[in-house]
Design a protein with these regions (language model features):
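Acidic, glycine-rich flexible loop segments
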Residues: 98-113
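Short beta-strand segments that buttress and anchor functional surface loops
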Residues: 36-41, 69-73, 94-100, 118-120
């Protein structure tokens, strides 16, 4: 009888522990809030530079339980609005976002790696991932931003938009 009592207590503890974990996960808001960042490795350009795009995503919870997604991309010396900006709804570990252009895209969260996988691809066809922006990794993000700007300002990477004219 004692064996069954101990086994019952263990099973009850496991069930309660799982319930508490699920409740905590639901109440903590999950990954869909705050600022997240990552780097898209876009490949080599014609001058041999490794081209990278700094991706920053800000998730904001709305009163109607939707999530506003603000996607920004550091492309060269300019930060532009990204193609993933829009409004999303949580679906389990995923966020289904309707972008401003009306396209539906999916963001996936991995509880193991603690990263969000974006519907963007690196040059090697692997998915682009982002991590939460913290005080500890903010300097890393800003260093990458500086490298991207510096590479874009190299003379061989400038795009000449002037038209040449020849005199006959």
């Amino acid at each position: 009888m004692k064996k069954y009592s101990i086994l019952g207590i263990i099973i009850l503890a496991v069930i309660l522990g799982g319930g508490v974990f699920a409740l905590f996960s639901a109440l903590s808001g999950g990954p869909w809030e705050g600022v997240w960042w990552g780097v898209q490795e876009a490949g080599m350009n014609w001058s041999g530079d490794n081209i990278r795009n700094l991706e920053t995503i800000t998730f904001t919870r709305n009163d109607d339980k939707t999530i506003t997604v603000d996607h920004r991309v550091q492309q060269g010396s300019k930060e532009v609005e990204g193609s993933l900006s829009g409004t999303g709804a949580i679906d389990g570990g995923r966020l289904i976002v309707t972008t401003k252009t009306g396209r539906e895209v999916t963001f996936s969260y991995s509880r193991i790696s603690k990263l969000i996988e974006l519907p963007l691809k690196n040059a090697d066809k692997t998915p682009v991932t982002v991590k939460p922006l913290t005080e500890e990794n903010n300097n890393d993000m800003e260093e990458i931003r500086s490298e991207i700007v510096k590479i874009s300002q190299k003379p061989e990477n400038k795009i000449d938009t002037t038209l040449s004219s020849t005199k006959s």
